[in-house]
């Protein structure tokens, strides 16, 4: 009996362990290092951290100057994600520095950064590495037309309209009419970096400067060029989000009412900060906008398996399964702008794929050109991971027995040849049998 019980227990334990490993493979480890300026931030930003924990993230909280900090051990990353809520740090503790963090991003890690007007050099340098330039220390975004009614007088408690958000629901969530509260430092994007995303910009009347000084020089950021929140998706699909405001993620801003100081402005009982912060965290930590390639098939129409080599002008069918991560599960992706290219150095065929159930497929005729080709799907859309699939095939010319017996375009030449033969035959008959009569006759 004991043996049977122990055997059953072992099977159950193995089943639970395998199920947990499968779930972990789908959701990712979710191990996240959170670096704080001080431990109090864990309490003042508890709603945001609680939402991450409820979604399965394993959060490790440490102060940014902890001497035991480490991102890499024995060549392996110890965490999947990094949260930097330590804007004023001047030197990270342990073996973490800007070079380590950039290596973490190059290795596929995701980073969420929150700055403030008291920004230190490490965050400024990290921003420069990612194509983001922060304004000087002690500066703030100022807007004399779009500030909250509770602003103390510096006009730095900005009310950002949802119209200033990036038009990408995958990144910023569903459209809403609730404005966002912002108090912090301004940023500008490197115009030579095409990977930077302007997630939330200031209004046309905003600028970044010292709030306690008269303006004596042109501000660092002005109008729509003033970035409040910026993002980056690297070419390896690693994601980084920079917020110029640490207060943006705070409980106080999540639960605050908001109303512009302008006469007749509408009052909202709650800001849109919490919804936007949750959407941003889902995107930056790859809970949203993640695509993958499933089964890829190609074969001549009417057959089910690919040949060793296709023949020019064959009618072929190509199919690909594309899935998206949603709620921790892979579900069929719904897109109407996915293209297939048939490439030999340059594309010879470019056509849209049509969705057929959970699969995208298309039929097309191969070009009358032989060589080594690729079926290529290169899908790169705002907010989604870069999707790439390439399948190499050979295309050969027609065999000798595959050519047409008579080519329609050559009919005039056939007619001239046969007419010449017929004319020669008639001429021969006439010449041989139609002799002139002799005089004796």
Curated annotation (Swiss-Prot):
Keywords: Endoplasmic reticulum, Membrane, Signal, Transmembrane, Transmembrane helix. It is found in: Endoplasmic reticulum membrane. Pathway: Protein modification; protein glycosylation. Coiled coil: none annotated. Residues 432-441 are cytoplasmic. The keyword Endoplasmic reticulum applies. It is a single-pass type I membrane protein. Residues 29-410 are lumenal. The chain crosses the membrane at residues 411-431. Its main location: endoplasmic reticulum. Residues 1-28 form the signal peptide. InterPro entries: DDOST_48_kDa_subunit (IPR005013), OST48_MD (IPR055459), OST48_N (IPR055457). GO terms for cellular component: oligosaccharyltransferase complex. It holds the Pfam family OST48_MD. Subunit of the oligosaccharyl transferase (OST) complex that catalyzes the initial transfer of a defined glycan (Glc(3)Man(9)GlcNAc(2) in eukaryotes) from the lipid carrier dolichol-pyrophosphate to an asparagine residue within an Asn-X-Ser/Thr consensus motif in nascent polypeptide chains, the first step in protein N-glycosylation. N-glycosylation occurs cotranslationally and the complex associates with the Sec61 complex at the channel-forming translocon complex that mediates protein translocation across the endoplasmic reticulum (ER). All subunits are required for a maximal enzyme activity. Component of the oligosaccharyltransferase (OST) complex. Belongs to the DDOST 48 kDa subunit family. This is Dolichyl-diphosphooligosaccharide--protein glycosyltransferase 48 kDa subunit. It comes from Danio rerio. The gene is ddost.
């Amino acid at each position: 009996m004991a043996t049977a019980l122990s055997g059953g227990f072992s099977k159950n334990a193995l089943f639970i362990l395998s199920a947990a490993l499968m779930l972990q493979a789908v959701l990712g480890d979710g191990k996240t290092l959170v670096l704080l300026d001080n431990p109090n931030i864990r309490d003042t930003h508890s709603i945001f951290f609680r939402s991450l924990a409820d979604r399965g993230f394993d959060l490790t909280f440490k102060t940014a100057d902890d001497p035991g900090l480490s991102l890499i051990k024995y060549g392996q990353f110890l965490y999947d994600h990094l949260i930097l809520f330590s804007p004023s740090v001047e030197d990270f503790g342990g073996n973490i520095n800007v070079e380590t963090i950039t290596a973490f991003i190059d290795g596929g890690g995701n980073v969420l950064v929150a700055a403030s007007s008291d920004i230190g050099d490490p965050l400024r340098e990290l921003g420069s590495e990612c194509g983001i330039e922060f304004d000087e220390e002690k500066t703030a975004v100022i807007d004399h037309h779009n500030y909250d009614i509770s602003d103390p007088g510096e006009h730095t408690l900005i009310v950002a309209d949802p119209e200033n958000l990036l038009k990408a629901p995958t990144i910023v969530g569903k459209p809403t009419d609730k404005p966002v509260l912002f108090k912090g430092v301004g940023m500008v994007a490197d115009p030579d970096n095409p990977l930077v995303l302007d997630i939330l910009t200031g209004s046309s009347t905003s600028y970044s400067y010292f709030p306690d000084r008269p303006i004596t020089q042109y501000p660092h950021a002005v109008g729509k060029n003033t970035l409040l929140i910026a993002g980056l998706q690297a070419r390896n699909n690693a994601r980084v989000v920079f917020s110029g405001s640490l207060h943006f993620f705070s409980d106080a801003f999540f639960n605050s009412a908001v109303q512009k100081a302008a006469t007749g402005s509408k009052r909202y009982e709650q800001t849109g900060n919490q919804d936007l912060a949750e959407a941003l965290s889902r995107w930056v930590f790859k809970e949203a906008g993640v695509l993958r390639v499933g089964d890829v098939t190609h074969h001549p129409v009417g057959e089910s398996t690919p040949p060793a080599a296709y023949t020019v002008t064959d009618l072929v069918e190509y199919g690909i399964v594309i899935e998206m991560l949603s709620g921790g599960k892979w579900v069929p992706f719904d897109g109407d702008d996915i293209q297939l290219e048939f490439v030999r150095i340059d594309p010879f065929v470019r056509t849209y794929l049509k969705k057929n159930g959970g699969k995208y497929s298309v039929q097309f005729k191969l070009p009358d050109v032989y060589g080594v080709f690729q079926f290529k799907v290169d899908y790169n859309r705002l907010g989604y991971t870069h999707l790439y699939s390439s399948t190499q095939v050979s295309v050969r010319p027609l065999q000798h027995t595959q050519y047409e017996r008579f080519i329609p375009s050559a009919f005039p030449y056939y007619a001239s040849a046969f007419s010449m033969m017929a004319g020669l035959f008639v001429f021969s008959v006439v010449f041989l049998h139609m002799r002139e009569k002799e005089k004796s006759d």
